[in-house]
């Protein structure tokens, strides 16, 4: 997929394969399901009102100028890192801030910390960067290069 399209996906989460028992459960759940009626079997897990309330909470998370700068520095560093051929776009910076808000909410805080940003960075950046051929020949992964990059950026206090 072209880089511009990949950049529109919020995150890349690597799940791996299910255990044998779990795969059997998946097969059993769907083996007699009529594919045309599959969408009817999907259950609502959240009400619109609850979703709006959660979005309102996310909009109330305090994001200091230091956190904004830190997120931007991380993404900007992907554009200058020697092992990265193509770095993250401004869309990556926005995604990093927005997902770090969720990390703060899950930690039951009304403010963002550097740890929220650092935690989300691999999920946000791993599909938005392209490693250099040399880095790939070394066997490096996007996640390893992102961790290396995070260690080079001063964490705000």
Where are these regions (language model features)?
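C-terminal engagement/docking regions of AAA+ P-loop ATPases
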Residues: 78-157
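Conserved AAA+ ATPase core "coupling" helix
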Residues: 1-61, 65-73
């Amino acid at each position: 997929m072209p880089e511009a399209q990949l950049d529109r996906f919020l995150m890349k989460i690597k799940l791996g394969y299910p255990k044998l028992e779990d795969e059997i459960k998946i097969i059993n759940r769907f083996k007699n399901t009529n594919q045309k009626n599959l969408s009817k079997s999907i259950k609502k897990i959240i009400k619109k009102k609850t979703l709006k309330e959660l979005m309102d909470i996310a909009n109330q998370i305090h994001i200091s100028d230091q956190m904004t700068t830190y997120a931007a520095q991380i993404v900007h560093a992907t554009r200058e890192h020697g092992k990265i051929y193509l770095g993250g776009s401004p869309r990556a910076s926005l995604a990093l801030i927005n997902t770090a808000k969720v990390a703060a909410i899950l930690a039951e805080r009304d403010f963002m910390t550097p740890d929220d940003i650092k935690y989300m960075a691999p999920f946000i950046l791993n599909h938005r960067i392209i490693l250099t051929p040399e880095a790939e020949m070394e066997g490096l992964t996007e996640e390893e290069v992102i961790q290396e990059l995070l260690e080079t950026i001063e964490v705000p206090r």
